[in-house]
Every structure is written in structure tokens, then in C-alpha cells.
Amino acid sequence: MIPLLFILFYFANGIEWHKFETSEEIISTYLLDDVLYTGVNGAVYTFSNNKLNKTGLTNNNYITTSIKVEDADKDTLVCGTNNGNPKCWKIDGSDDPKHRGRGYAPYQNSKVTIISYNECVLSDINISKEGIKRWRRFDGPCGYDLYTADNVIPKDGLRGAFVDKDGTYDKVYILFTDTIGSKRIVKIPYIAQMCLNDEGGPSSLSSHRWSTFLKVELECDIDGRSYRQIIHSRTIKTDNDTILYVFFDSPYSKSALCTYSMNTIKQSFSTSKLEGYTKQLPSPAPGICLPAGKVVSHTTFEVIEKYNVLDDIIKPLSNQPIFEGPSGVKWFDIKEKENEHREYRIYFIKENSIYSFDTKSKQTRSSQVDARLFSVMVTSKPLFIADIGIGVGMPQMKKILKM
């Protein structure tokens, strides 16, 4: 078994390997300002300008989070489990007394979703050891700490989170797959919205609850196949819209990538009826962002607590996936092609296979490497991150196929 850090891979020019100093298990990867941060147990590696650096931290400390908090110091933080006592450090390894570890890293090694926007930090990380999975706003100047209600967020967490403008207000959007039923399991993919500067509920018991949480189902169907398990998501901003890319898995031995217009999604949140609600909507309507200092009425909060699902289904652009791929896809990223506005190359990985889909030619190419792939991050060139090499000697790229 060969310890690896990642692969610099080009379909045209082959492969280049960069190795860990010691055998490591990759815990997390983040790309911040074109710097790759790779969290392992007890350390974080950074890679930029073809240079690899390691910062050692405490032992028994799974680094799950690398995040740039946009406060006055504009520090990049790395946060980990720290032997069951979550903690954050600056990238040079020094202590960071300004940011508590809870909410930035879990108590035990697990997959996390965390974002920072205008100094506000949000995550699906439990702040107590036995806590229920929730989506929280827990640090920064956006207002009180807020969290979702019980069982709104699935136990395995989110598959994407981002902030986007809706008129003059910032809204945070999250993606997840809900599982319904006990005898016949049904999976429903959702995108949910909340106002970033939500003031919380109107009573002392609800003041730390999101008061603008609404969700709507996403559709990704073709030829009778319905893709419903969200793997991963990305957004691309255009001149007048934000395009949401969502990779789905399915029971059909296939996966699919669907794209959605955020303008369409925002319109649905603004105008759609609430599923199961038949009365006239209160004022302000559920999900509407209010000016600073304004709190929703008791009536509005009661409605959104009981009826937070839209009576609508968001269809993808062109009413079908961009393409279908193999099942078991783990991660993907997107790169705009040089000198070709709004044409992209989409990279995705499965086990030890690498794929590239060209949105212009509609061709998919694939290759295999002697390594277990962890994730893919696109900078000026795609970085394919692997945590284990298989066999003896440096792993090789096996083949390139057109599909």
C-alpha cells in the first residue's frame, strides 16, 4: 500500500504524483483561493504553486474542516475532533482563541458541511455529543444562533450549501435527500431555503429556530428512470442567473447530472402553495425575508412549522439530465473551458476511475489509476486526490477511453 496525497492529472499529458511524508488517511479536502487543504489525522497539508507543506497538530485529531472566516483577520482555520473536544487552529498551527471548536468540527470523525459568508458561519455539525443533526447558523454578525427543527435534516447530513441573492436579501440554500416510509422506502431530494439574516421565531421558545425554512423537491428523470439520491452539488454563476449542478445516484446502476435555474427555484419559493395547507396565507407569507429587526408573526411561524414543503417540483433545465454516468460516483467538480464561454468540462470520480464530460461535444472520457480516489478539485488544472495507492511502485494510469 502506497501513501499518496493527490494526483495531478491531465487526459492529454498523463499523471504526476505527490506523496505524503508518512502513511496518511485523508479525512477532508477543501479548495480555498486556489490552495488545496487536505486534512488527515493530526495534521493538515496545503498545496499551491506546486509546493506541498505540512502543519502538524495534536494526535487523535481528525481534521474535518478547513474554512476561511471573512472577519477582520481573514484567517484560514483548520478544525478537528481533537480527541472528542473539537478545536480550531490557524493554518500555521497556532491556537485560535476567537473561534470555538463546537460547530466547526464534530466530536467524532464524520462527513460535514460548513460554509462561511460575510463573516457568518453555518454548518450541519452537532454542537453536542449526542445531538440531533441540524442546520445551524452559529457564528458571526448575522444574528442569534439558529437551528432547524428535530428531524428536518437527515442523519447523514447535507450534500451541499451555498448563499445566493434573492432580490436585495441573501438566502442560504441547502441540499439533502429525505428518506420516507418504513415498509416501502421512498427517497426525495430537496433544496431548502432560509433567509441568511433570519431573526428567529416570535417567542422565547422559538427565538433560536429558523423562521423562514421552506423546501421543494428536485426532479431528475429520463426514460422512466428517476434519480433521487443526491451525491454532491456545485453552483456556477452566469450573467443573470446561478446554475445549480446536482449529481444523483440511483438503483439502476447509473448516476445522472441535472442542472437547475436558481431563478426558477427562487420563483417557486416566492409563489408556490404549501403542500397540505388550504387556508389563506398569513402576512407576511412564510419564507419571505423581512427587514433587519423584524420578526415573523406567531401565525406565520406556526404555519411554516407545520407546512414547510412547497406544493411544487423543480424540473431540470431541458427537462432531463445533462448526461448519465456509472453508479457509485463519489465527487465531481466543474471547469469552464478556455476561450469557450459557458462551455464546461465536468470531472467526476468512482473508486479508481476518473471521468471527464465535455458539455459541448457531449463526450465522456474515462481512465483508471492504481489508487483509491477520494475527491476531485478543479483549479487551473484538475487535482484528483487519492489516499491509498495499490500495489508496488508508483501507481500508473491504465487507460483512456471515449464513451
UniProtKB/Swiss-Prot annotation:
One Pfam family per UniProt: Sema
Annotated signal sequence range: 1-14
Subcellular location: Secreted
Entry keyword Amino-acid biosynthesis: no
Matching PROSITE patterns: SEMA
Chief place where the protein resides: secreted
Gene Ontology BP terms: integrin-mediated signaling pathway; positive regulation of cell migration; regulation of inflammatory response; semaphorin-plexin signaling pathway
Domain of life: Viruses
GO CC annotation: extracellular region; plasma membrane
Keyword Signal annotated: yes
GO molecular function (one): integrin binding
Domain called Sema: residue spans: 15-403
SMART domains, per the entry: Sema
Record keywords: Secreted, Signal
Function: Acts as a semaphorin-like protein and binds to host plexin C1 receptor. May alter the movement of host plexin C1-expressing cells including dendritic cells, monocytes, or granulocytes in the proximity of infected cells. May also regulate host cell cytoskeleton of neighboring cells to improve viral infection.
Family as reported in the entry's similarity comment: Belongs to the semaphorin family.
Assembly, per entry: Interacts with host VESPR.
Stated name of the protein: Semaphorin-like protein A39
